[in-house]
Protein backbone atom coordinates (compact mmCIF):
# COMPACT_ATOMS: atom_id res chain seq x y z
CA UNK A 1 0.00 0.00 0.00
CA UNK A 2 1.36 3.41 -0.95
CA UNK A 3 0.69 5.49 2.17
CA UNK A 4 1.82 8.74 0.56
CA UNK A 5 -0.49 8.24 -2.42
CA UNK A 6 -3.38 7.48 -0.06
CA UNK A 7 -2.63 10.56 2.04
CA UNK A 8 -2.44 12.75 -1.08
CA UNK A 9 -5.72 11.32 -2.35
CA UNK A 10 -7.42 12.03 0.98
CA UNK A 11 -6.19 15.65 0.80
CA UNK A 12 -7.23 15.95 -2.87
CA UNK A 13 -3.59 16.74 -3.69
CA UNK A 14 -2.68 16.03 -7.28
CA UNK A 15 0.82 16.72 -8.51
CA UNK A 16 1.39 18.62 -11.72
CA UNK A 17 1.09 16.21 -14.66
CA UNK A 18 4.38 17.38 -16.16
CA UNK A 19 6.22 16.75 -12.90
CA UNK A 20 4.67 13.30 -12.70
CA UNK A 21 5.86 12.52 -16.22
CA UNK A 22 9.32 13.84 -15.35
CA UNK A 23 9.42 11.65 -12.24
CA UNK A 24 8.45 8.57 -14.22
CA UNK A 25 11.12 9.28 -16.83
CA UNK A 26 13.71 9.79 -14.08
CA UNK A 27 12.66 6.64 -12.22
CA UNK A 28 12.96 4.72 -15.48
CA UNK A 29 16.51 5.96 -16.01
CA UNK A 30 15.62 8.26 -18.93
CA UNK A 31 17.53 11.22 -17.50
CA UNK A 32 18.04 13.15 -20.76
CA UNK A 33 14.34 12.84 -21.61
CA UNK A 34 13.40 13.88 -18.08
CA UNK A 35 15.62 16.96 -18.36
CA UNK A 36 14.16 17.85 -21.73
CA UNK A 37 10.63 17.42 -20.40
CA UNK A 38 11.08 19.51 -17.25
CA UNK A 39 13.17 22.17 -19.02
CA UNK A 40 10.44 22.89 -21.54
CA UNK A 41 8.17 24.43 -18.93
CA UNK A 42 7.83 28.04 -17.85
CA UNK A 43 7.98 27.55 -14.10
CA UNK A 44 6.45 30.84 -13.04
CA UNK A 45 3.30 30.29 -15.06
CA UNK A 46 2.91 26.53 -14.83
CA UNK A 47 4.41 25.57 -11.48
CA UNK A 48 3.38 28.23 -8.96
CA UNK A 49 2.24 25.62 -6.42
CA UNK A 50 4.96 23.12 -7.17
CA UNK A 51 8.23 25.07 -6.94
CA UNK A 52 9.76 22.81 -4.29
CA UNK A 53 9.11 19.68 -6.33
CA UNK A 54 10.22 21.33 -9.57
CA UNK A 55 13.62 22.40 -8.21
CA UNK A 56 14.12 19.09 -6.39
CA UNK A 57 13.43 17.02 -9.51
CA UNK A 58 15.61 19.27 -11.68
CA UNK A 59 18.50 18.93 -9.23
CA UNK A 60 18.15 15.13 -9.06
CA UNK A 61 18.18 14.88 -12.85
CA UNK A 62 21.22 17.15 -13.13
CA UNK A 63 22.97 15.06 -10.50
CA UNK A 64 22.44 11.88 -12.53
CA UNK A 65 23.71 13.68 -15.63
CA UNK A 66 26.89 14.79 -13.78
CA UNK A 67 26.23 18.52 -13.90
CA UNK A 68 28.46 20.79 -11.83
CA UNK A 69 27.88 20.39 -8.08
CA UNK A 70 27.47 24.15 -7.66
CA UNK A 71 24.50 24.20 -10.05
CA UNK A 72 22.96 21.14 -8.42
CA UNK A 73 23.32 22.69 -4.95
CA UNK A 74 21.69 25.91 -6.18
CA UNK A 75 18.68 23.95 -7.47
CA UNK A 76 18.37 21.96 -4.24
CA UNK A 77 18.62 25.21 -2.25
CA UNK A 78 15.72 26.65 -4.26
CA UNK A 79 13.69 23.58 -3.32
CA UNK A 80 14.52 24.15 0.35
CA UNK A 81 13.62 27.83 0.14
CA UNK A 82 10.27 27.08 -1.50
CA UNK A 83 9.29 24.04 0.53
CA UNK A 84 10.75 24.33 4.02
CA UNK A 85 7.27 24.75 5.54
CA UNK A 86 5.60 22.13 3.37
CA UNK A 87 4.46 18.61 4.27
CA UNK A 88 6.28 17.33 1.18
CA UNK A 89 9.67 15.65 1.47
CA UNK A 90 11.38 17.72 -1.25
CA UNK A 91 12.96 20.36 1.03
CA UNK A 92 14.37 17.99 3.67
CA UNK A 93 15.56 15.57 0.98
CA UNK A 94 17.19 18.51 -0.80
CA UNK A 95 19.00 19.43 2.42
CA UNK A 96 20.15 15.82 2.74
CA UNK A 97 21.38 15.77 -0.86
CA UNK A 98 23.33 19.02 -0.38
CA UNK A 99 24.89 17.57 2.78
CA UNK A 100 25.97 14.47 0.87
CA UNK A 101 27.53 16.59 -1.88
CA UNK A 102 29.48 18.63 0.69
CA UNK A 103 30.53 15.44 2.47
CA UNK A 104 31.86 14.06 -0.82
CA UNK A 105 33.80 17.32 -1.31
CA UNK A 106 35.17 17.01 2.25
CA UNK A 107 33.45 20.28 3.21
CA UNK A 108 32.47 18.77 6.53
CA UNK A 109 31.24 21.92 8.30
CA UNK A 110 28.89 22.68 5.42
CA UNK A 111 27.82 19.04 5.30
CA UNK A 112 27.02 19.07 9.03
CA UNK A 113 25.00 22.27 8.62
CA UNK A 114 22.84 20.69 5.93
CA UNK A 115 22.42 17.40 7.81
CA UNK A 116 21.20 19.53 10.74
CA UNK A 117 18.95 21.56 8.44
CA UNK A 118 17.39 18.31 7.24
CA UNK A 119 16.83 17.18 10.82
CA UNK A 120 15.26 20.53 11.75
CA UNK A 121 12.36 19.90 9.35
CA UNK A 122 9.51 17.68 10.49
CA UNK A 123 6.05 16.38 9.63
CA UNK A 124 6.77 15.37 6.05
CA UNK A 125 6.47 12.19 4.01
CA UNK A 126 9.27 9.64 4.52
CA UNK A 127 10.50 11.58 7.56
CA UNK A 128 11.90 8.62 9.48
CA UNK A 129 14.02 7.32 6.60
CA UNK A 130 15.31 10.74 5.55
CA UNK A 131 16.15 11.68 9.14
CA UNK A 132 17.93 8.36 9.65
CA UNK A 133 20.15 9.09 6.64
CA UNK A 134 20.92 12.57 8.00
CA UNK A 135 21.77 11.16 11.44
CA UNK A 136 24.04 8.56 9.84
CA UNK A 137 25.74 11.32 7.87
CA UNK A 138 26.40 13.30 11.04
CA UNK A 139 27.87 10.22 12.73
CA UNK A 140 30.18 9.65 9.74
CA UNK A 141 31.54 13.18 9.62
CA UNK A 142 31.78 13.75 13.37
CA UNK A 143 33.80 10.58 14.04
Can you describe what each PLM-predicted range is?
Residues 45-46, 50-57, 61-66, 70-86:
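Intrinsically disordered, low-complexity segments enriched in Gly and acidic/Ser/Thr residues
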Residues 16-20, 55-64, 90-100, 130-139:
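"A position-specific structural signal for the A-helix of alpha-solenoid helical repeats
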Residues 28, 65-67, 105:
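Structural motif corresponding to the intra-repeat A-B loop/turn of tetratricopeptide repeats
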Residues 1-41:
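Extracytoplasmic and endomembrane cell-envelope/extracellular-matrix remodeling and assembly machinery
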Residues 34, 71-72, 111:
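Single-residue signature of alpha-solenoid repeat helices
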Residues 2-11, 39-49, 78-88, 117-125:
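Solenoid-like repeat scaffolds
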Residues 11, 18, 47-52, 69, ...:
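Inter-repeat boundary and helix-capping residues of tandem alpha-helical solenoids
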Residues 1, 77-80, 96, 106-126, ...:
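TPR/TPR-like (Sel1-like) alpha-helical repeat modules
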Amino acid sequence: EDKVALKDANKNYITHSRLLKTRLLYDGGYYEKALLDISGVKIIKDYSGFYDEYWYRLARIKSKLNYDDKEIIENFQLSIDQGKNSANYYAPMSALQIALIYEKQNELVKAANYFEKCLSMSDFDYERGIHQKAKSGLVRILD
